[in-house]
Regions:
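Non-heme di-metal
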Residues: 2-190
Length: 190
């Protein structure tokens, strides 16, 4: 049974990373895989706010770009925002419901938080360079090439989510099949 807080005493050092017992207290003193806690600490050390960075030079540089350079610059920002939007919610939607290690849960929370900051940083750039940022944001989903690239990442997330839900809710498929989809999704998004 899935629950927000498992009331049973569980030794999480003996649990698999995924599809083990539901989590309870977020203990950060004993780890099965200390590398995840170290990664979380490293990520937290990189915390910054995009608004703290001056973009005056970027704006003047952008104004000097040729039209094709502006197009490439803008398309890249759109793509980065789209991918960071996926990564900002993907780990929580796909992997967290099946996570069974507190240190991995913490690491994934930090991961998606920093993906959100990345997306904010690109938004900060757009807001400082374009007189009407909505023109950029409103056309983001109109670019077929950006959408095609995004589909290549979201496909594996979606396939894992579907397989995991079918397995846990409807009893369809096997745990091995679901874990294969999990592996493919993790490799694809990393």
């Amino acid at each position: 049974m899935s629950t927000v807080f498992n009331m049973d005493k569980v030794d999480f050092t003996k649990q698999p990373m995924f599809f083990g017992e539901a989590l309870n207290a977020q203990r950060f003193d004993v780890f099965k895989y200390p590398v995840f806690d170290k990664l979380t600490q490293t990520q937290l050390g990189y915390f910054w706010r995009p608004e703290e960075v001056s973009l005056q030079k970027d704006r003047s540089d952008y104004l000097d770009f040729r039209d094709e350079q502006k197009f490439i610059f803008t398309a890249n920002l759109k793509y980065q925002i789209l991918l960071d939007s996926v990564q900002g919610r993907g780990p929580a939607m796909a992997f967290m419901p099946y996570c069974s290690l507190p240190e991995l849960e913490g690491c994934m929370n930090a991961w998606q938080f920093f993906e959100n900051i990345h997306s904010r940083s690109y938004t900060h750039i757009i807001k400082n360079i374009y007189s009407n940022p909505s023109e950029v944001f409103d056309t983001m989903l109109d670019d077929e090439k950006i959408i095609a690239r995004a589909k290549s990442v979201t496909k594996s997330y979606d396939e894992f989510i579907e397989a995991a839900q079918q397995f846990t809710v409807a009893g369809k498929g096997t745990l091995r099949e679901v874990k294969t989809k999990l592996f493919l999704a993790m490799v694809n998004v990393n």
